[in-house]
Swiss-Prot record:
Protein name: Holo-[acyl-carrier-protein] synthase
A Pfam family matched in the record: ACPS
Keywords: Cytoplasm, Fatty acid biosynthesis, Fatty acid metabolism, Lipid biosynthesis, Lipid metabolism, Magnesium, Metal-binding, Transferase
EC annotation from Swiss-Prot or TrEMBL: 2.7.8.7
Residues that bind Mg(2+): 8, 63
InterPro entries: 4-PPantetheinyl_Trfase_dom, 4-PPantetheinyl_Trfase_dom_sf, ACPS, Ppantetheine-prot_Trfase_dom
Essential cofactor(s): Mg(2+)
Keyword Magnesium: yes
Family membership noted in the UniProt record: Belongs to the P-Pant transferase superfamily. AcpS family.
Functional description taken from the UniProt entry: Transfers the 4'-phosphopantetheine moiety from coenzyme A to a Ser of acyl-carrier-protein.
Compartments where located: Cytoplasm
Record GO terms (molecular function): holo-[acyl-carrier-protein] synthase activity; magnesium ion binding
Gene label: acpS
Any one GO BP annotation for this protein: fatty acid biosynthetic process
């Protein structure tokens, strides 16, 4: 049974405008990335050939996950409580910790499905939570 559904869309240019462009060292000081990404995700952001697109997709995925939890970001759920990764085939995965994991348990959720898509100007994500 579906216990949560969330979707989000992000304009990639808005995210790219908040990323320093002076090289790899500048990426290390990106405040938005530090606020949104976990340490593991941040390392991949810095190594990415398209850091703006990477961050936009992760931002959309985390917002979609928070909406599926019924809280949005806030109310005990932070960006740091939601981690986006990829399986060996490249499919996106979402993992919950701390407040996000507690909220998932309150909903009776046990599985999360994540889809991320991007085009030239936008990144979008959808999360479905199942019991």
């Amino acid at each position: 049974m579906i216990v949560g559904l969330g979707t989000d869309i992000v304009e990639i240019a808005r995210i790219e405008a908040r990323i320093p462009t002076a090289g790899d060292e500048a990426l290390l000081s990106c405040r938005l990335a530090k606020r949104v990404l976990t340490k593991t995700e941040f390392a991949l952001f810095v190594a990415s050939s398209q850091p703006g697109r990477y961050l936009a997709k992760r931002f959309a995925a985390k917002e979609a996950a928070a909406k599926a939890l019924g809280t949005g970001i806030g109310r005990g759920v932070s960006f740091q409580h939601i981690e986006i990764s990829n399986n060996t085939n490249g499919a996106p995965l979402v993992a919950f910790s701390d407040g996000a994991a507690e909220r998932l348990a309150q909903l009776g959720g046990s599985r999360a499905h994540l889809s991320i898509a991007d085009e030239k100007h936008y990144a979008t994500a959808t999360v479905i939570l199942e019991s």
